[in-house]
Amino acid sequence: MKTINFGNFNSAFTLMQVFNTEKKCIRYLESKLWKNSEPVSPYDPTSKVYRRGDGMYRCKNTGKNFNIRIGTLFEGSKISLRKWFYAVYMVTCHTKGISSVQLSKDIHVTQKTAWFMTHRIREAFKQDYKEKFDGEVELDETFVGGKNKNRHWNKKAKKCQGRAFVDKVPVMGILQRGGKVFCKVVENTSYKQLTPPILCKVKHSATIYSDEWQGYRLIPKVYKYHVVDHGHGIYVSGGAYTNTIEAFWGNYCKRAINGIYNWVSRKHMQRYFNEFCFRYNTRNVSINERFAEAILHCKSRLTYNKLTA
C-alpha cells in the first residue's frame, strides 16, 4: 500500500490541520497498527484479507468484516476518529492533560461521553511489570486527597498525622534515574503492600534509594540500598537522594490533579497515574512521536459497563 507522509505537528491546531479528514485518520491508524499498512484480520491473523469497496475488509477464513477500529479503544464508538485524535493528543501531549468538561466543549460531545473517552485513553496506558528497572532506582510514596483543614467540621478525618493519612489514597512510585517511572495505587504503605511491586519491577542488580520509611525494611535483604534520612533534615547524601521522584510527584501528578482534575476518586485513580507516567516516560521525544506512541498503546478497549461497575 502506498505510504503517506503525515508530516510533523506540534500543537492541537496543526494536529487538526494534518488530520483534516476521517480518511487520513484511518490511514494513519493503519500505518501504525498494521505492518506496512497491510490489513491483518483481528479474527485470524493468518487469513487472507479482501478489501471491500466501502472501506471495510473481509477475513477470508472467518467471513467476518472488520476495519482498523476493531480491537482498539476506538471500537464500538460513534465518535469520529478526528475527535478521538484530538482527545488522545490533549490527554497525552498537553502539559497537564484536559478535563472532561473542557474536552466536551472542544469537540462538541456531552461531558459524560468526554469522561468515558478520557478513561478509555488512560486505560490504554495500563502499566505492567515486563520492563524491568535497573541501575539507580528511587522509591517514594505520595498521598492523594483533599486537605483535612478544608473539610466541614463533621467530615474531618481523625488521626491523620504522619503517614497515617486515613482520608487519602496512597500511591507508590518506582523511578529509574534517567529512565522511566512506574506508579501503583496501594491499599496502604506497609511493607506487605510496597515490597511485591518492587520485587517484580526492579532487577536485583539495581541500587535503590528511599527515605527512612519502615515499609522498605525488606529491601536491604535483596538490593544494594541507601537511605536518605528526611526525618533529620537530610535530603541529599552523596548520590543518595529521592529528589527525582519527588519532582515527578510535583510536576507531573499534583499539578494535573490540583490544576485540572481537582478531585480524583480512589476507584479511577490508577488510570490517572497511568496518564502521568506516560507523559513522564515520553518526556524526551517530540510531540508527534509521543502521539504516535500513544496510538500504539490503543490496542485495548475499556467498556462503559466495566468503567462504571
Language-model regions, residue ranges each:
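Residue-level recognition of single "structural anchor" positions
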Residues: 1-309
